[in-house]
Amino acid sequence: MHELSLVSSILDIIEDYAAQDGFRRVNNLRLSCGRLSGVDLQCLRFAFEVLSRETRSEGATLEIDFLPIVISCLNCGEDTEVEYVEASCPECGSENVLLAGGTEELRLLELDVD
């Protein structure tokens, strides 16, 4: 369950920001996560609930934006959002494609603090 280490890292980042900016409490945090990252949403929420106890993030609302899977065609230049990884370009049919998005693991985007 790598979600524990991901949440631990996010909480460390929050503590670093708190040391710099002097805030006492996190009300809300927004993360982004690629659809192909392998992060389990339920496990992530559970890990956050457990690991944030007795920290300035305890009770904070956790929002997660999922980033779409995007393939980029090297022939026609189109970047296309897809539901699953495709081996060919939906626009021109070329198999000369690269995975261009959706693999990002986890990123802290926004904090609402007091």
From Swiss-Prot:
Q: Which GO terms describe its biological process?
A: protein maturation; protein modification process
Q: Which cysteines are joined by disulfide bonds?
A: none
Q: Which GO terms describe its molecular function?
A: nickel cation binding; zinc ion binding
Q: Which UniProt keywords apply?
A: Metal-binding, Nickel, Zinc
What's its job? Involved in the maturation of [NiFe] hydrogenases. Required for nickel insertion into the metal center of the hydrogenase.
- The protein here is known as Hydrogenase maturation factor HypA
Family per similarity comment: Belongs to the HypA/HybF family.
InterPro entries per the UniProt record, alphabetical = Hydgase_Ni_incorp_HypA/HybF_CS, HypA/HybF
